[in-house]
């Protein structure tokens, strides 16, 4: 979500949040949110800077992937929060360094994110 003003981004977030709540069937929605305000682009000819409010909402199906609970070789201590959902994967155990791969990260994203069907239901509501 992007808006040149604070009120606009709040209104859009509230609108989307109401729609998001409906796909979780009266349970608290599992979401990660990152928001920021600041320089988005610079006019290279020396003109005005463009500043805007921004927000990304990551819709979740569950808090932790199965590998978080697994033991032995299948265990991987990853519990995606906002850093991981934004593409930064801090590895807290040395033993997990050799286990993490692009394929495993993709699998974790798919496991903890909403399914295609749930996303379609949400986009149908907001169209």
Predicted regions and their residues:
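HIT superfamily nucleotide-processing domains
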Residues: 1-127
């Amino acid at each position: 979500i992007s808006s040149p003003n604070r009120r606009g981004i709040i209104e859009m977030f509230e609108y989307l949040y109401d729609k998001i709540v409906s796909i979780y069937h009266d349970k608290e929605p599992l979401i990660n949110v990152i928001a920021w305000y600041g320089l988005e682009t610079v006019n290279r000819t020396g003109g005005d800077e463009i500043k805007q409010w921004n927000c990304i909402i990551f819709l979740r199906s569950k808090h932790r992937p199965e590998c978080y609970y697994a033991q032995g070789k299948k265990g991987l201590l990853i519990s995606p929060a906002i850093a991981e959902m934004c593409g930064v994967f801090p590895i807290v155990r040395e033993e997990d360094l050799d286990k993490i791969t692009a394929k495993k990260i993709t699998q974790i994203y798919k496991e903890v994110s909403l399914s295609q069907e749930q996303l379609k239901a949400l986009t149908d509501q907001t169209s």
